């Protein structure tokens, strides 16, 4: 097997044993059976395709565009704004000015209820589309402020933080077709480690979602390897200077299963070998 997650667990995309442990158990089993039956010990040949080939390839591609959640300060309310919208605004303003004295979880619950009230009133024709749009903008702004106040080490905060990270994550539109380059993500929910190739000296303080460049809404990645296990968002360093993402452990089956999709050309390929001095050398390039 291959520990794609790095969790050393019994998950479908992980393994809770080492290669040495696996080999010892196999050899020991044959050794004991042959000794019991007084048979010669055979040469053992294993065909462990995924374990042998997964590590040999990495997909590197560039971020084409980004879509961020609204981060500007919401506009002031009209005098005749509906009551639930005023409740939302009051929560936002207290958070924006200083600590409101209420717990982040309580504020989140109250804001969610106020937004639900606005949506219900809109469905019944009691508030305008502009009111609903402003309520959603204020609700997002409350979430962004709460994100900064939540402590990931606090068990009570953790669930809410995960929810806000997913809802308020920026979307990264990346120059590849998932169906061509990572078909197992779509087909069997395979998890691959993903890492930015810049800014690794900075703490990962923002969250993102990866989207490919195809016309299909399934062209997205929903599960990401994180230090705490598998998360719904990808941790990234702060800033807009991240331009390259690497998808690791893609050497098993992805290229042979993938095919041309949405007029994407074939992915450029570079063969790299390590020479006798331990230096990487490019031995072949295909465009």
Where on the chain are the PLM-derived regions?
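Active-site-proximal loop/short-helix segments
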Residues: 1-11, 50-58
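Glycine-rich tight-turn/loop motif centered on a GG-T
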Residues: 5-20, 69
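Gly/Pro-rich turn-and-neighbor structural signature
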Residues: 6-7, 27, 39-41
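Alpha-helix-loop-beta-strand connector modules within alpha/beta enzyme cores
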Residues: 19-34
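Charged (often Lys/Glu-rich) extended helix/loop segments that serve as interaction or gating elements
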Residues: 35, 39-287
């Amino acid at each position: 097997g291959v520990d794609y997650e790095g969790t050393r667990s019994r998950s479908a995309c992980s393994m809770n044993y080492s290669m040495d442990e696996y080999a010892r158990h196999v050899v020991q089993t044959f050794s004991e059976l042959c000794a019991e039956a007084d048979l010669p010990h055979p040469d053992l040949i294993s065909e462990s395709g995924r374990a042998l080939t997964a590590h040999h390839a990495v997909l590197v591609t560039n971020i084409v565009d980004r879509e961020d959640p609204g981060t500007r300060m919401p506009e002031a309310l009209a005098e005749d704004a509906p009551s639930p919208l005023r409740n939302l605004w009051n929560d936002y303003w207290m958070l924006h000015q200083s600590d409101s004295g209420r717990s982040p979880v309580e504020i989140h619950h109250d804001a969610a209820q106020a937004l639900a009230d606005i949506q219900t009133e809109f469905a019944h024709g009691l508030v305008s589309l502009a009111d609903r749009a402003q309520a959603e903008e204020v609700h997002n702004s409350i979430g962004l402020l709460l994100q900064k106040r939540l402590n990931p080490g606090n068990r009570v905060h953790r669930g809410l933080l995960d929810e806000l990270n997913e809802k308020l994550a920026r979307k990264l539109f990346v120059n590849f077709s998932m169906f061509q380059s990572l078909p197992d993500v779509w087909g069997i929910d395979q998890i691959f480690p993903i890492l930015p190739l810049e800014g690794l000296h900075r703490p990962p303080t923002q969250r993102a979602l990866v989207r490919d460049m195809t016309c299909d809404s399934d062209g997205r990645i929903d599960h990401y390897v994180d230090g705490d296990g598998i998360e719904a968002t990808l941790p990234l360093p702060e800033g807009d200077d991240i331009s390259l993402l690497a998808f690791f452990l893609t050497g098993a089956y992805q290229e042979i299963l993938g095919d041309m999709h949405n007029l994407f050309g074939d992915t450029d390929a570079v063969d790299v070998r390590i020479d006798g001095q331990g230096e990487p050398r490019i031995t072949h390039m295909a465009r």
